[in-house]
Amino acid sequence: MARVDNYEQRFGGIGRLYTPEGLARLRQAHVCVIGIGGVGSWVVEALARSGVGQITMIDMDDICVTNINRQLPALSGNIGKLKTEVMAERVKLINPECVVNIIDDFISPDNQAEYLNRGYDYVIDAIDNVKTKAAMIAYCKRNKIKIITIGGAGGQTDPSKIQITDLSKTIQDPLLAKVRSVLRKDFNFSQNPQRKFAVDAVFSSQPLIFPKMGEGCEVSATMNCANGFGAATMITATFGFFAVSRVIDKLLK
């Protein structure tokens, strides 16, 4: 009997779900993940466990102890290490043949042309800087690069409220609302609320839960180490899994 390829042994369950032809497509796919934090780290995990053949990660942040509540690589022994490097090691344990590229930088309007023009089959945006998100989405749209954006995952407790819609239609998400505003103001996206942006967005319809007074500094719209909304793994991970599910569906169509 012929020896079954190790890749097929590891990801045969994916092939039975998405067909052998679908698995072969995933094996050839190249997906870029921007932001390897509370959402992005779970995105990378799901891509790796789905047999995606090449993953590029863009981030230069290190792991801090306050990431432990929501980020996959955040363990006691990893504090201070780069998130991308820890996740790259993990991906190789899941799929040794996966090509993992690390871009040790934060994406910005100044470098996005260099970092985004690398032949990706899909870009997954998991950052929380409004102007950077907007500029990146606009760049991808102009250059016909497939992108899905992910909204704010902080301040929520109910994963059943997470969904995907066009970026023009999200609700209860201040981050994506600000991104919409910048896209319309600075990048000539349609002002007509009935017109879609043709960009998928992951968001939650749950009203935000704000920290009680005295539980930290001023509340920011992010989930950083010092202040901002509280966050839980079952929400941040689910945001990431929704994004990967949509990306796989699009890759296989």
At which residue positions do the language-model features occur?
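Acidic/polar active-site rim loop that often engages polyanionic ligands
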Residues: 66-73, 156-166
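Short amphipathic alpha-helix with an adjacent loop that forms part of the alpha/beta core around
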Residues: 110-119
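Hydrophobic/small residue at the entry helix of a nucleotide-binding pocket
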Residues: 39-40
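Glycine-rich phosphate-binding loop and adjoining beta1-alpha1-beta2 segment
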Residues: 52, 58-95
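Conserved N-terminal Rossmann-fold NAD(P)-binding element of oxidoreductases
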Residues: 33-35, 58
